Amino acid sequence: MPRINALPDVPRWAALAAHAVPLVTLPSGLWRIALVAGLPVAAEPVRTVGESLYVLSLTVVSEALALLTLGLVQPWGETVPRWIPLLGGRNVPPLAAVIPALAGATALFGLWGWVGYVMAANLAAGSVTDTPAQLVLLLACYLPLLAWAPLLTVSAIAYYRRRTPANGMLTFMS
């Protein structure tokens, strides 16, 4: 069984969930990079520099946010790395990690609900793909994103349970 890099008290399932998050976001990012590179992955190519910057920024930001999930199972999620000015070496208050993680998961659940509604109600203008091969590639790259919200949720809950005192009392500053 492969070794997953995580703190010793992190349950294996939580470490696997946290490590899976950057992997489930990667295919969609690669699809967007292919789109910007001009590969025939969509019906319409990216036409302007502004569109290219937007698509690439979306890719970088989504992957960076996905990588932050690793903080829920790594030492830097409990103690701020020393190289960070002013905060280095301080303990991370558990709720300072859990609240943004659960807010992000909630936003992702909402986003997928909205996308599902738009698709089911046929509200989207035009089609993203021209050919069946493009559609299969698009689905293969974007369907893994459906796992992001549940994986982030269970990772955040495991982090909270691990960092919460036995009496269950936890404040934002603890």
Where are these regions (language model features)?
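Membrane-interfacial, low-structure loops and terminal tails that flank and connect transmembrane helices
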Residues: 1-12, 81-91, 166-174
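Cytosolic juxtamembrane helix and N-cap/initiation of the first transmembrane helix
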Residues: 2-28
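Hydrophobic alpha-helical membrane-insertion segments
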Residues: 23-27, 96-113
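Loop-to-transmembrane helix junctions at the membrane interface
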Residues: 72-103
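Hydrophobic cores of alpha-helical transmembrane segments in multi-pass inner/ER membrane proteins
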Residues: 60-69, 143-156
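Membrane interfacial helix motifs at helix-loop boundaries and amphipathic/re-entrant anchors
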Residues: 31-58, 113-142
